């Protein structure tokens, strides 16, 4: 059941480079990222071996406090790739072959990050959805964060955290507008405790008539797309049905 419905958090920030600029400031023994988080270089390098440059650039102090003392030797990473847009399936997998986009999920001691990287510019840029679904044996904190990184049409690197969030008893979802531009990477992170599975899914609106209302019309279910996102049957064909990812805590 839904516990909360609409949450709109808007932020659009320019930054120097998605791929090449790792931090605002470097000293002999620390790095300060663009969110102002001061990280020892040894810790920064260890985390960078797990997370993307984008994540490291904009990791918040709250996120850093959650993950800084985790045992990185126990980090689990799974990835799927998908080339078949409109493949109406609820497949949950750990590997596919792709020319379009890749979905990755990281478990760092219960702090789970799911990221979607586009290998080519999506033709349709409407309202997409990212969501986590959890087993009943797993608990989730109220803290979660969504980010979208991209290059604008003027070739300027951008960060957007604009989303409509939905909280459910069995997880959380974020609906967001795909921004105009290229080199898109979307990211959803949340903190979990307990033992059991956490499932992740990204669903792209592959129909130009998809609306915000369509992209909000879902619940979380194992019978949904990617084993997570169950759209209203009347509008589910507007989304691409990409397979999902999962991790066992």
Regions found by a protein language model. Give the residues of each.
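Sec-dependent N-terminal signal peptides of Gram-positive bacterial secreted proteins and lipoproteins
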Residues: 1-24
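N-terminal propeptides/leader regions of secreted preproproteins
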Residues: 23-104
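Mature secreted bioactive peptide module from preproproteins
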Residues: 83-249
């Amino acid at each position: 059941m839904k516990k909360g419905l609409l949450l709109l958090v808007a932020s659009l920030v320019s930054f120097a480079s998605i791929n090449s600029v790792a931090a605002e400031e470097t000293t002999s023994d620390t790095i300060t990222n663009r969110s102002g988080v001061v990280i020892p270089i040894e810790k920064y390098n260890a985390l960078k071996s797990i997370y993307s440059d984008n994540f490291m650039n904009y990791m918040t102090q709250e996120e850093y406090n959650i993950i800084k003392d985790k045992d990185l030797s126990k980090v689990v990473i799974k990835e799927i790739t998908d080339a078949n847009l409109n493949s109406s399936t609820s497949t949950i997998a750990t590997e596919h072959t792709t020319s379009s986009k890749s979905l990755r999920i990281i478990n760092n001691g219960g702090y789970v990050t799911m990221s979607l990287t586009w290998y080519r510019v999506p033709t349709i840029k409407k309202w997409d959805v990212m969501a986590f679904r959890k087993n009943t044996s797993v608990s989730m904190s109220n803290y979660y964060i969504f980010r979208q990184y991209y290059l604008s049409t003027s070739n300027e690197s951008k960060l957007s955290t604009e989303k409509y969030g939905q909280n459910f008893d069995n997880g959380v979802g974020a609906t967001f507008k795909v921004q105009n531009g290229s080199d898109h990477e979307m990211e959803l992170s949340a903190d979990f405790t307990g033992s059991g599975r956490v499932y992740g899914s990204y669903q792209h609106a592959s129909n130009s008539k998809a609306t915000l209302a369509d992209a909000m019309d879902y619940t979380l279910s194992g019978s949904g797309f990617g084993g997570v996102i169950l759209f209203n049957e009347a509008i589910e064909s507007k989304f691409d049905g990409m397979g999902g990812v999962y991790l066992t805590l």
